[in-house]
Curated annotation (Swiss-Prot):
Designated name of the protein: Elongator complex protein 1
Entry's family note: Belongs to the ELP1/IKA1 family.
Species assigned in the record: Saccharomyces cerevisiae (strain ATCC 204508 / S288c) (Baker's yeast)
Pathways per UniProt: tRNA modification; 5-methoxycarbonylmethyl-2-thiouridine-tRNA biosynthesis
Consequence of changing S551A: Does not affect elongator complex activity
Modified residues (Phosphoserine): S529, S539, S551, S636, S828, S1198, S1202, S1205, S1209
Protein keywords: Cytoplasm, Nucleus, Phosphoprotein, Protein transport, Transport, tRNA processing
GO biological process per UniProt: protein transport; regulation of transcription by RNA polymerase II; regulation of translation; tRNA wobble base 5-methoxycarbonylmethyl-2-thiouridinylation; tRNA wobble uridine modification
């Protein structure tokens, strides 16, 4: 396991040295000139160059006949058709084509010839008639051209003339710059001394370099080699830059991928630094900018040759160095330079010292470096600073090699006049993923060597490996058998078998040994080439044989691995792209170039499985069985289907013909899952329990689903080991990481639970930090029924304690461990639940019922089992204590009682210590006190951090007191005041209620409990009632106090309390009966207080009944709008004059109040309706101006903008949050600001965003007031009519009806608030909508018919 790299990467790379390069497809064709067809003797056209055309996905070739100067350009389309784009003669004979480019966007061909001509050919894309092609010479370099190269963006042409001038031209052949190459250029230095580093890396001058060369010569003369007698601070030698005999002395040009710089490599004659009278030839390269300005020159490197290639997506420049005269250290190396010309690493190509390297070239994504030799092409990849030879192509007379500019692993090269197109792909050579053979075996090709790492045995970080074996030649493909003990590798013409006796022998250090080298001639013809290899079990090997147009598969019997025999050769009649074993190694499966996947059995019988919509670069095949929740383990062949899963080059994942997902980077399968990684850095799982495949849902942010796991950026699948629930990934930098995905771990846990293997399930949960609740939650009834089995299997006390103490109330199988086995494949992934709000947490606690608690249920069941068996009780004492302490609420009293019963003091002390570990020691201390066991409390206190000076005196005092007093003191200390009162009352049980009891009741508000204690002793209960009545009066609960006083016979106090409670009938009844002399004063006091509270009818009743004051009574009835009672009282008292003196003025006053109210209401309705219409019109015309207007600023708040201020949007201004707080949910308003905001909302100041809401609410308040006034208005109308004030009555009724009609006509318009205006944002930044304000119902005014005119 390697720690994650937290540094970001500018570009996601998917290369991996754990994967091998294989040849997917190889095609070739030989272009022939149309003018020479049928007349080969007259003209001899040769293939000069070819390029990829990305616009039409075609290949453009240049054919030439140098003896007559004829040129022909042909375009070969993907469908096999051929277009002749140009055919012309050049003016010079025996010329050499240095550069050719096809500008498909402008239909132009550009040729650069060695003798100096730059020619363009512009063709007609419609007619494609070469006769209509316009040929132009754009310019000529008089002394010829040595090298030419177009930039990747096809905008700039860099050339070096034979006069050693670097010329840069634009696409329109306009000169950009010209620079003459001088020897002094090599003295330019961008080599920066940073003031640190090793001594031998620092510049010391040419004198020091000469001394080093002399030291090297002296060492050689003495016969010493290697590091013997070598000064470790001095290098063997300092390079002079001498060229080798195999250097072509050619000038080469290479552009950087971004086209900002290009490099020019050439041979220079420079003075010898040791002997200035002599000169040496030195190979060096110069770096120029796009504008042709010299940027840097390379340092001297002895043996560097002409090959040059700038890494397209990096800063390194690759070349070849041939090291000679170093004895055992002689080598041919690929060397790298930085842009400033300094060396930056190298690797040994392992080539013979006399083998010539023609060129080197990077592919478009910089993952592969092609080293081109005369008769073969080697492909190298790198990871973890190690270079691997992954593939070798064999040809003869290779003239050029080119990578496709867009398809990363498509290569084109020419040999003997043929154009060869080869497609490569990464292939993970690995063993089976089927239990129990899932050793995670990975085979890595590195030239002749096959590196083997069984990841289940050892996660060896690359480039290291566990075991290896070496073959006679470079390996083209390799495969592993079902048992992981036999390996097959193919060289150019040989099939090699290696084996180990057993995996156990490999563990002991034994490497696989080659047991058979099986030549190709033994089972096929020489025209067939060996391409791929795969196993059927351990007994049969399939070898993919290739010819130019067809593929065949040779099946070999290897039961005697030392003598393989040919079973049959299966004719496919199409080109095979990929060959591999199926999931269970019972068949071979292959894909043809049209996307068809077929299965091949051991007898050579073929069966088509599916045809992918697109060609895939990697695939797996497995038989998938349809299962359901009801019939989980039963399946048959009829309910299954062979399914092929494949990834295309553009990352599409298919299950047969169904597109499952896009942006997929790697895949693997197990017996239960399809696993794949994505470009979004996720590892996803698909259950293989149904053949009904559908597109997978998108993975959104915040997903919490067992089928999705985040992984390190750019990681890909290397292997899956189901028996260990592990997945091995490789990060972009090359390190391996073993992870244990939750879905695989949970699958194992669930399987163990259902099989009642609780200990295995527990160990897995404990190892992988899975919540132990799942042991119960996944099958609750099964768990309870087998609880004793569970306890016996677990066996260990600490494991049981861990299980019980970690229990929670949540059902984890419905939350974080929700099973997805039978969830629909297209169903959205589960999302992380929002955190509970404070209110939700509060309500959850409030609604908690211990009777239905899951934790309590499990703890009770455990206690029942353990307490029923004496052996269990003795062995699992700590577990019993844990169960008591884990109950909700915790039952510490029962745990402490159990501990107090222990006879062994050491065991008791140990149990107390353990209980204090489980719970807060202060809580345990108080629980011990609640048992009234002072010695146990002392034992607990000693485990705490309490000061002994505090608890020892207290405990001593308790010990010294008698039992009842001790219990009282303990309960008083613990705050159990009711129990303390009980103990206190028991102390003086036979006497009267003591002052101590009274004081304790008063100090702790225990009146009701005191009344309950003395329920059967009325005398003592009355004492409590007396102090309770005083307490009620002091708390303004006058009615209850008055009743209590009346019960006790304290009528004076009762009458006063009734007066305070405004209970005038009760107060007057006591006054009349017991205190007649105080009737008048009590009545006047009541009238005053009732009048103050607008209870005019009650006050009038007292005036009339107890003071006989008719006039005042009539006036009070009129104030209450009870004109009918006022008239009745006046007439009944035979005081008709009061009708005119009191009733009529009262009617007039009532008329004035009602009339004024109606006028105000009508004016308010009209004005507010008008303002509402203005606001809504303004909002509709310009919403931003409406919502974005400035809100009121406090006088003491600066409104000047600052760099840190946050601009409010019209959305957040209405919700009271800034853009930042609305997004993060973090409210930065202080409580003071919030209160200010609420006050502004309530005021609804004109011009603010709160005005509309305020106006609507104001109309609502008006309607409520009208409804309240309506009964009074009816009484006023009736009273006016009875007193013949018909005009006033008519006016009141008419105005009231008009106001109500006005409201009815406009109430819906007033209350129509838009959804946008109801939008709010809560404290968590979530948008919500306040409820719509219901439109109030306007009821009709009950009209009087006599004034309804």
């Amino acid at each position: 396991m390697v720690e994650h790299d937290k540094s970001g990467s500018k570009r996601q790379e998917l290369r991996s040295n754990m994967r091998n390069l294989i040849t997917l497809n190889k095609g070739k064709f030989k272009p022939t000139a149309s003018t020479a067809e049928g007349d080969e003797d007259d003209l001899s056209f040769t293939l000069l160059d070819s390029v990829f055309d990305t616009l039409s996905d075609s290949i453009t070739c240049v054919l030439g006949s140098t003896d007559i100067g004829a040129i022909e350009v042909q375009q070969f389309m993907k469908d096999g058709s051929r277009n002749v784009l140009a055919s012309f003669n050049i003016q010079t004979f025996d010329d050499k084509l240095l550069s050719f480019v096809h500008f498909a966007d402008i239909n132009q061909l550009v040729f650069v010839f060695e003798q100096g001509d730059i020619i363009t050919a512009t063709y007609d894309p419609v007619s494609l008639d070469p006769a209509e092609t316009l040929i132009e010479i754009m310019g000529t370099i008089d002394n010829g051209i040595a090298a030419a190269q177009w930039s990747y963006d096809e905008e700039t042409l860099a050339m070096v003339t034979k006069d050693r001038n670097v010329v840069v031209l634009s696409k329109l052949f306009e000169p950009i710059s010209e620079y003459h190459l001088e020897v002094d250029d090599l003295k330019i230095s961008k080599h920066v001394t940073v003031g640190w580093g090793k001594k031998e890396t620092q510049f010391r001058g040419k004198g020091a370099r000469a001394m080093e060369r002399e030291a090297l010569a002296s060492l050689k003369a003495s016969g010493l080699v290697g590091n013997q007698l070598r000064d470790p601070t001095m290098p063997y030698m300092v390079d002079t830059g001498d060229v080798t005999a195999l250097d072509s002395h050619e000038i080469t040009i290479s552009w950087r991928g971004d086209c900002d710089y290009f490099a020019v490599s050439s041979v220079e004659e420079v003075p010898d630094e040791d002997d200035e009278t002599k000169s040496i030839k030195r190979r060096a390269f110069r770096v120029f900018s796009r504008e042709g300005q010299l940027d840097s020159a390379s340092e001297p490197v002895t043996g560097m040759e002409h090959q040059l290639s700038w890494k397209p997506q990096g800063s390194l420049i690759a070349s070849i160095q041939r090291k000679t005269d170093l004895g055992e250290e002689d080598s041919v190396d690929v060397i790298f330079f930085e842009r400033n010309g300094l060396r930056h690493g190298e690797f040994d190509t392992r080539l013979p010292l006399d083998e010539k390297v023609e060129s080197v070239c990077w592919n478009s994504n910089s993952e592969a470096l092609a080293v081109v030799l005369a008769n073969r092409i080697q492909l190298w990849t790198s990871k973890n600073y190690h270079w691997y030879l992954k593939q070798e192509l064999y040809a003869s007379d290779i003239s050029y090699v080119k990578w496709h500019p867009e398809k990363d692993f498509t290569l084109m090269f020419s040999d003997a006049g043929f154009i060869n197109i080869v497609d490569f792909a990464y292939k993970m050579a690995q063993g089976p993923t089927l239990e129990p053979f899932d050793n995670g075996t990975s085979l890595v090709v590195d030239g002749r060597t096959v590196n083997i790492t069984p990841l289940a045995l050892a996660n060896v970080p690359p480039p290291m490996y566990y075991r290896d074996f070496e073959t006679p030649g470079n390996v083209l493909d390799v495969a592993c058998s079902f048992s992981n003990e036999i390996y097959a590798a193919i060289n150019k013409d040989v099939l090699i078998f290696a084996a180990v006796p057993s995996i156990e022998e490999m563990k002991k250090g034994k490497h696989p040994s080659i047991v058979c080298e099986f030549p190709k001639s033994e089972f096929t013809s020489e025209v067939d080439s060996l391409r791929q290899v795969a196993f059927i079990n351990d007994s049969i090997v399939g070898v993919l044989l290739d010819t130019d147009n067809l593929s065949r598969i040779a099946l070999l019997d290897i039961q005697d691995i030392t003598q393989p025999t040919l079973i049959t050769i299966v004719e496919v009649y199409d080109k095979i792209v990929l060959l591999r074993s199926d999931f269970d190694y019972n068949h071979l499966v292959y894909e043809t170039r049209d996307g068809t996947v077929c299965q091949l059995d051991a007898e050579g019988q073929l069966m088509e499985i599916t045809k992918f919509p697109q060609l895939v670069r990697d695939f797996r095949v497995k038989r998938v069985h349809n299962t359901s929740a009801e019939d989980d383990d039963n399946w048959s062949a009829e309910s299954s289907e062979l399914v092929a899963f494949g990834i295309t080059n553009n990352g599409k994942l298919f299950a047969n013909q169904v597109l499952l997902a896009s942006a997929v980077t790697s895949l693997e399968i197990t017996d239960s899952f399809l696993l794949f990684t994505t470009a979004q850095h996720n590892l996803q799982f698909v259950h293989l329990n149904s053949t009904d495949f559908k597109p997978l849902p998108l993975v959104e942010e915040g997903v919490e689903d067992e089928r999705v796991r985040a992984i390190e950026r750019g990681s890909i699948l290397v292997s899956v080991i189901p028996s260990k629930s592990s997945v091995v990934l490789q990060a972009t930098r090359g390190n391996l990481e073993t992870i244990y995905p939750r879905i695989m771990v949970l699958a194992e846990v669930r399987k163990n639970i259902m099989a009642k293997r609780y200990k295995e399930a527990f160990i897995v949960c404990r190892t992988h930090r899975i919540n132990l609740d799942i042991l119960h939650d996944y099958a609750p009834e099964l768990f309870i029924e087998n609880l004793e089995v569970f306890i016996n299997q677990i066996g260990r006390v600490d494991y049981l304690n861990l299980f019980i103490s970690c229990l929670s109330e949540d059902d984890v199988t419905k939350t974080k461990y929700k099973e997805t086995l039978y969830s629909g494949i297209s169903k959205s992934f589960g999302m992380e639940p929002a955190p509970l709000t404070e209110m939700q947490i509060y309500m959850k606690k409030k609604m908690f019922d211990p009777k239905t608690s899951k934790v309590n249920k499990i703890c009770d069941a455990v206690l029942n089992v353990l307490l029923s068996n004496p052996e269990y009780k003795k062995k699992y004492l700590q577990t019993i204590i844990t169960a008591y302490a884990s109950q909700n609420p915790q039952n510490l009293s029962a745990a402490l009682k159990l501990i107090s019963e222990l006879e062994n003091s050491e065991e008791k002390d140990s149990c107390v210590t353990y209980l204090c570990f489980l719970q807060d020691v202060n809580v345990v201390y108080k629980s011990a006190l609640s048992l009234y066991d002072v010695s146990l409390a002392l034992l607990v206190a000693q485990k705490s951090q309490m000061d002994p000076r505090e608890y020892l005196p207290f405990l001593q005092e308790l010990q010294d007191n008698e039992p009842l007093r001790r219990k009282f003191l303990i309960d008083d200390y613990l705050g159990n005041y009711e129990k303390a009162l009980e103990h206190l009352s028991e102390i003086d049980k036979d006497g009267n209620v003591s002052e101590e009891v009274i004081d304790y009741v008063e100090s702790h508000d225990l009146y009701k409990h005191g009344l309950a204690l003395y329920r059967y002793d009325s005398e003592k209960q009355n004492v409590i009632y007396n102090i309770y009545a005083k307490h009620l009066s002091s708390n303004q609960m006058y009615t209850d106090a008055a009743v209590a006083y009346e019960m006790l016979g304290k009528l004076k106090e009762a009458m006063g309390a009734y007066q305070s409670a405004k209970r005038w009938r009760e107060a007057m009844s006591i006054a009349v009966q017991k205190f007649p002399e105080e009737v008048e004063s009590v009545a006047e006091e009541l009238i005053s207080s009732l009048t103050f509270e607008h209870r005019y009818v009650d006050a009038a009743d007292i005036q009339l009944e107890y003071l006989d004051n008719v006039k005042e009574a009539v006036a009070l009835y009129c104030k209450a709008y009870r004109y009918d009672i006022a008239s009745l009282v006046a007439i009944k008292a035979k005081k008709d004059e009061l009708l005119e003196e009191v009733v009529d003025p009262g009617l007039g006053e009532g008329f004035g109040i009602i009339a004024e109210l109606l006028a105000d209401c009508k004016g308010q309705i009209n004005s507010q309706l008008r303002r509402l219409r203005e606001l809504r019109a303004k909002k509709e015309e310009n919403p931003y101006a409406f919502y974005g207007q400035e809100t009121e600023q406090a006088d003491d708040v600066s409104v000047a903008p600052s760099e840190t201020s946050t601009q409010e949007s019209f959305f957040t201004r209405y919700t009271g949050k800034t853009g930042g707080t609305a997004k993060t949910g973090a409210s930065r308003r202080t409580a003071k600001n919030k209160r200010r905001e609420e006050r502004k909302r309530a005021r609804g100041k004109k011009g603010t965003i709160y005005e509309e809401e305020y106006l609507v609410q104001s109309v609502g308040r008006l309607i409520e007031r009208l409804n309240q006034t309506k009964p009074d208005a009816v009484r006023v109308v009736e009273g006016l009519c009875r007193r013949n004030m018909r005009e006033q009555a008519h006016q009141i009724q008419k105005n009231f009806v008009e106001v109500l009609d006005l409201l009815k006509a406009n109430v819906k318009e007033i209350y129509s608030i838009s959804e946008k205006d109801r939008e709010r944002v809560n404290e968590n930044g979530e948008v919500y909508y306040i409820p719509e304000i219901p439109v109030p119902e306007i009821h009709d005014f009950p009209k009087s018919h006599i004034v309804d005119f």
